[in-house]
Amino acid sequence: MGGRGAPPYAGGPGGTSPRDSTVSRVSRAGVLAAYRDGVTVICELAAHFTDVSWLSATPCAEWRAVDVAGHLRCVADDYHEYLDDAPASRLARLMSTNAPADSLARKLARQNAAELAALPDVSGPEHIMAFADSARSYGRRLTPCWDLSHHTYRGTDVTVGAMAGAACAEWHLHAWDLARSLGKDYRPADPELVLTAWRAGTPELWPVLTGWDGGDPWSFLLTASGRDPGWVQVLGPDPGLTAAPE
């Protein structure tokens, strides 16, 4: 998923949600467009890596850029599996335990590590090509089943569309990871939409969210997903990247 461990805010009850946004305020077209943009920008960033820079550190602790590429490939395939088996997938069974967010995060982190270790030892570009094919194929599956149940958590029904929002946010967050590894910066074209979409697909994290002050939604999402917005690899002259307009 989007983070590597329990989010920093996932420790206690209470708190407020970002601008009290709800999934109903995010259009299907908007989420799908942002989803496609996330896949596109990952592919664009991947083209900037060399054989050497694929081995560079990233904001994801202990993951090199090539590991992020492999993780993206795994997660895109996982999303297909979850949709194939919904609403009785292994993710749905995990969420139905109603475990707290930090426990869920640890279990998903172990799953991520096991899947990454099982991947073939291929190059970053090969992982990204497999990711892009899988992620785009998943995107094409979403519209016909958008309102169907994907899984539930503590009485909240997470639809296929809401899970698409979580996937959308995951792509943009990992785009930032890759950009930072290159010494660049990145933010999506509509960070508030991405934040709201992420919220819709992750009810296990809400409403245990604190610290929102109406500031920059992208910085907030980076921090909420366990990232340090100030993480720096190499700052070059490149002014950064923005998501391609739809």
Where are these regions (language model features)?
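Conserved alpha-helical segments that form or flank metal/cofactor-binding pockets of metalloenzymes
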Residues: 66-110
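Basic, often amphipathic N-terminal segments
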Residues: 44-45
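Structured surface interface patches that mediate subunit assembly and partner/cofactor docking
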Residues: 4, 8-33, 48, 52-61, ...
